């Protein structure tokens, strides 16, 4: 009955146009009535406690760092260096898009922000160069979803808080699969570019490459600081977020001198709006997660899947399919917040490496961001590239196919994720 109440309120709320956060609060209130324990004060306190976490403080810092990068000239310099290096290759702008997305991923941690920033810079150039815009936009959208995988990752922070796992370990575990996703996309683009006979950009001189490198090195140094700090134990994810925001602000104002006080004010407003949306969603989900636990929903799921516990691989496949289905119709953050407390006890009972599970969870949900019928990143790329949603779906289809194929490879060869983490540590 608890499952029906929760799903009914969630789907009903979404159907009438409620934001996900309010739909989750509705679910929480309905479960409290059903459990005969409704109390506004308890709900309010749980809501506050849901966002009262030092680890979650990393989110506004990384959001702010991403906003400063876009407004302060860091993003365009990050795109310019790959442009000078590989832009002259056949279909070179596609490689630039993936490389820029991977570098941006190591700075922003948000798929939507990453996709919007890279697409705004590259899609007009691709259109002018007579690239098939839907295919090019699909590639950039697919590159954008690497942002939740390569550290610093906002979804990893949320997953770590929800599951009690080390956020630093999750960050380190995301490096190798994120790079593999990027390599897979570039290989797919190489195959397509060879068939489409795409034009080349003018080859940059060594002087132009050097100038681009010198100009962009301040921006490129940021992921070195973040990952180096994690690796050395110099700072926590929250402290890393503060360092990233301060460093980005320093570079934008002192080095590049493209950040005015008026621009900074708009950046702070934008970061505050984004942070408020994410944190309210986290807090609302915490209310539902707490009541789901009281209603013993995790135990029900555990009992349902108990016969598969002795076969961890089969159990893991079933869980991945379930996450895939949910991720296709729901955004990444609420999927993580709702399913993590339900699935994590079962994962631990089956002896599945929880860090590996966390990485696979986020990869699966990230691909869902470019998978119809919802596809939030697809909506972003459609708007930026001025494409119909159907055209964006056709453009992204081959990349979705290869990314899900890579996900299957990760399922059957977990060492591709686990071993690089051991090497890094």
Swiss-Prot record:
Membrane topology summary: Multi-pass membrane protein
One GO CC term on file: tripartite ATP-independent periplasmic transporter complex
Pfam families with a match to the protein in the record: DctM (PF06808)
Matching InterPro entries: DctM, TRAP_DctM
Domain of life: Bacteria
The entry's keywords: Cell inner membrane, Cell membrane, Membrane, Transmembrane, Transmembrane helix, Transport
Protein location: Cell inner membrane
GO biological process, one term: carbohydrate transmembrane transport
Transmembrane segments: 3-23, 54-74, 93-113, 139-159, 170-190, 209-229, 235-255, 277-297, 314-334, 355-375, 399-419
MF GO annotations: carbohydrate transmembrane transporter activity
Family membership: Belongs to the TRAP transporter large permease family.
Quaternary structure note: The complex comprises the extracytoplasmic solute receptor protein YiaO, and the two transmembrane proteins YiaM and YiaN.
PANTHER family: 2,3-DIKETO-L-GULONATE TRAP TRANSPORTER LARGE PERMEASE PROTEIN YIAN, SIALIC ACID TRAP TRANSPORTER PERMEASE PROTEIN SIAT-RELATED
Stated role: Part of the tripartite ATP-independent periplasmic (TRAP) transport system YiaMNO involved in the uptake of 2,3-diketo-L-gulonate.
Full protein name: 2,3-diketo-L-gulonate TRAP transporter large permease protein YiaN
Organism of this sequence: Escherichia coli (strain K12)
């Amino acid at each position: 009955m608890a499952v029906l109440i929760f799903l009914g309120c969630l789907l009903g709320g979404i159907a009438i146009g409620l934001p996900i956060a309010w739909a989750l609060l509705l679910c929480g209130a309905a479960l409290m009535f059903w459990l005969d324990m409704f109390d506004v004060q308890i709900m309010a306190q749980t809501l506050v406690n849901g966002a009262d976490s030092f680890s979650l403080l990393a989110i506004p810092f990384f959001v702010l760092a991403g906003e400063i990068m876009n407004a302060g000239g860091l993003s365009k310099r990050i795109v310019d260096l790959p442009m000078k290096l590989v832009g002259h290759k056949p279909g070179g702008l596609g490689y630039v898009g993936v490389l820029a997305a991977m570098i941006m991923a190591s700075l922003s941690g948000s798929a939507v922000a990453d996709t919007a920033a890279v697409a705004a810079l590259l899609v007009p150039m691709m259109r002018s160069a007579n690239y098939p815009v839907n295919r090019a936009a699909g590639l950039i959208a697919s590159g954008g979803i690497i942002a939740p995988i390569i550290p610093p990752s906002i979804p990893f922070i949320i997953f770590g808080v929800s599951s009690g796992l080390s956020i630093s370990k999750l960050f380190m575990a995301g490096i190798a699969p994120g790079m593999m996703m990027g390599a897979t996309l570039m290989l797919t683009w190489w195959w397509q570019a060879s068939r489409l006979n795409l034009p080349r950009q003018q080859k940059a001189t060594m002087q132009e490459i050097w100038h681009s490198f010198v100009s962009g090195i301040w921006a490129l140094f940021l992921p070195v600081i973040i990952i180096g700090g994690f690796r050395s134990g110099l700072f926590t994810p929250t402290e890393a977020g503060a360092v990233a925001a301060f460093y980005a602000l320093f570079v934008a104002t002192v080095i590049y001198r493209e950040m005015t006080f008026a621009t900074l004010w708009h950046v702070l407003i934008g970061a505050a709006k984004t942070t408020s949306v994410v944190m309210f969603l986290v807090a609302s989900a915490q209310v539902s997660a707490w009541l789901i636990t009281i209603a013993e929903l995790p135990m029900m799921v555990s009992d349902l899947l108990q016969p598969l516990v002795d076969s961890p691989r089969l159990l893991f496949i079933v869980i991945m399919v379930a996450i895939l289905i949910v991720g296709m119709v729901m955004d990444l953050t609420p999927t993580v917040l709702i399913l993590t407390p339900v699935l994590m006890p079962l994962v631990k009972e089956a002896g599945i490496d929880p860090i590996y599970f966390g990485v696979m969870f986020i990869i699966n949900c990230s691909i869902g961001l470019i998978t119809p019928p919802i596809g939030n990143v697809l909506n972003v790329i459609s708007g930026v590239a001025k494409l119909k949603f159907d055209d964006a779906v056709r453009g992204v289809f081959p990349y979705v196919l290869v990314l899900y194929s890579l996900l299957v490879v990760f399922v059957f060869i977990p060492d591709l994720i686990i071993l690089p983490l051991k090497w890094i540590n």
